[in-house]
């Protein structure tokens, strides 16, 4: 989403500390700071912004950044880069001459969309930046991590102490492995399936894109089963599934 406020050269970038619960990432590394500084763009990092990511203020300073004491100081810059969408406590910092670059997922957060429109902020959502081949380069890293974590978490919740049925992903001598069904063969789905296959589970991937399924057949070399996705194939796959990973993406839509 973007609300144009005129073409202006960006000379300063602010990096506020993330305030969303359980969010420990920071939107820039010291290497990124160096790149901005090389271009003549000054970077202002809120103190402690990188602590949860094990990047202390001193590392940002060594890269050329200026550490500022408050979120307001970081938000006061021409462009602000974040990891997650602004929380309501941050709406006060939105303004017409600000460019905000972050993951927004506006379909899931209508209050954020309304706040951006009201403030007339230029907002660029990482997840909707698209190349000419329709790929989503800024969403891909998040998707890769999400897919791998989905299988890892799913394996844990199959354990009895977590309320599961006591199914081991890779089985054991004389015991079948888990049946894992992945719906969607994009970045999330592929990574979820790859980890499940590495844990020696029986893996089935469903997708409507047959070219994508052909590609996965080639790189997975028999470690997974690919199926054309439709109501019937999904129903049949789910009957015997121990773990199901939903990995369907509609760009810009609510997950």
Q: Where in this protein do the model-derived segments appear?
A:
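Short, charged, surface-exposed secondary-structure boundary motifs
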Residues: 77-78, 110-113, 134-136, 214-216, ...
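Glycine/serine-rich phosphate-binding loop and adjoining beta1-alpha1 elements at the start
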Residues: 2-12, 18, 88-179
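Glycine-rich phosphate/diphosphate-binding loop of Rossmann-like nucleotide-binding domains
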Residues: 16-55, 163-249
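Short beta->alpha connector loops at strand-helix junctions that form conserved
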Residues: 46-47, 70-71, 103-105, 125-130, ...
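Short, hinge-like loop/turn segments at secondary-structure boundaries
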Residues: 60-64, 141-144, 220-225
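Conserved beta-strand edge residues that scaffold enzyme active sites
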Residues: 50-51, 74, 130-131, 210, ...
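A structured beta-alpha segment of the ubiquitous adenosine-cofactor-binding alpha/beta core
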Residues: 64-78, 85-86, 226-242, 248-255
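An N-terminal-biased, well-structured beta-alpha scaffold segment characteristic
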Residues: 2-115, 119
